[in-house]
């Protein structure tokens, strides 16, 4: 492949996010063209307090599950850090990448800052990010495959493009699962070299752990929206999870940060026309606030406190060093004089 072709592919991928965002924004406007902002605001306020509380609990459990991605990845590279450290790095990394998109760059930067400080090598951090990415895709792929058989296909009959997209997504996810598990079964003891890094192929046991963790994370994230949505529309949880997995996966593949606009459009298109779209969009906005905005504020504040504490601790160490070093130097000098 020539250099020009590689550059062209990179440009297409980088601009695809803008294209899908504009497309999703247009479809979103079309779905909501008959509603006002006050209708959507009333929909958010109409969500019962108990539902919002349960959504917040599901969100907290979801981010705890996300932090286990880092725990699993650390075990893969043989790294050892305290439990609170990988929890902080995992939750903060995902709080940033969920909002900013491009998880390897946005979430990877904060992980690199933290893990290098905790004596994890840069190459191992890259491996951790790769394993975490596979963990997410395994879980999401498993849910998409299961949901394909559980979600009524009549849901997407009104849109030929959506129907084709769902079938393509199902095939992609199924192939991903089959190839990954086949690789872990038959090539477990082998490794793959990419650049200067050597990746040991995970065991089948680890592949199962990755898939289960990815499914758990997706279900908990889905529960956040489900609790916001149920006051307005009655939908079986299994069918809902299918729609959620499809919408979430579509948002990820679109390259739009946080899948914003794309995720909402899939839901609005999939749900029946008899449902009040303003209520659905209000529930989706509440989900965005609970699962994206609040964790970013909370984890960002916690990281700020940690950085301040670390800085004050380093300042304390420097002050102690300034006091102790001159005393030690004078003691060494006096010992030298005595020996002379």
Regions found by a protein language model. Give the residues of each.
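Predominantly cytoplasmic-facing regulatory/coupling regions of multi-pass membrane proteins
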Residues: 1-91, 150-252, 277, 282, ...
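Membrane-interface alpha-helices at helix entry/exit sites of multi-pass transporters
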Residues: 84-88, 103-106, 117-134, 275-286
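Transmembrane alpha-helix interface/packing and boundary motifs in multi-pass membrane proteins
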Residues: 92-101, 243-264
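Membrane-embedded alpha-helical segments of transport systems
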Residues: 96-100, 124-144, 250, 285-297
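Transmembrane helix boundary and interhelical loop/hinge segments in multi-pass membrane proteins
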Residues: 103-112, 262, 266
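Interfacial segments of multi-pass membrane proteins
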Residues: 114-124, 243, 247, 264-280
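Hydrophobic alpha-helical segments and helix pairs
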Residues: 117, 123-160, 164
